Amino acid sequence: TPLTLIKGPLENIILKKQVDAETREDLNVMKQNTERLLNLTNQLLDFRKTESQGFRLNFAKCNVTEVLKETHVRFTSLAKQKGLEFTLQVPEKDFYAHVNREAFTKIISNLLNNGVKYAESYVHISLEVPEADDNNSFRIRTENDGVIIPNEMKEEIFKPFVRFNEKEDGKVTTGTGIGLALSRSLAELHQGTLAMGAGEENNTFC
């Protein structure tokens, strides 16, 4: 894409020794914004695919526990930067299910990104599996203690470009409002669901 063609030369310029500190800082900001735009473009394309009639995912047996651990590790540094307690709870035995690994990873990534972005002090993710031997039935639950999303917004936030935005103590969060819509569509393509819980003490997605 054109954004990818912009990102490459930017990275090359940043690596040059003769670039002064002020210019390098500006270039890094440009690179970060380019990456955000690239990520948004990819998410929009993915969302359009999931909404296309006849679109299907290919499923294969996947180590769900492994995906959760890997994704948790990817967000650990960002959570630490924000001073968050960032925990993962999984059964002792690895759990396998037939999923589309790439799509499943996107769902978890979006939920954790959302949690880390809005949380005040903690983000918790857990894997719940049935006692019966059912390799396609499980639940992922994420919780964060950000500003509580009101009941009237708990369905609205799953619509494209709808984002709950509340200023508190002068803090403003930014986002595109596409991640949750994409995650729900991908969950539904797995014959699953994605919704917000009714709890008032935290924001729960499962």
Over which residues does each language-model region extend?
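Helix-loop junction within the histidine kinase core
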Residues: 48-59
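Conserved catalytic submotifs in the C-terminal HATPase_c
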Residues: 58-63, 80, 85-95, 130
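Short conserved segment of the HATPase_c
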Residues: 149-161
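Short acidic helix/loop segment immediately C-terminal to the autophosphorylated histidine
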Residues: 14-21
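Short alpha-helical segment of the dimerization/phosphotransfer core of two-component systems
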Residues: 32-37
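Short alpha-helical Gxxx[C/S/T] motif in the catalytic ATP-binding
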Residues: 174, 179, 183
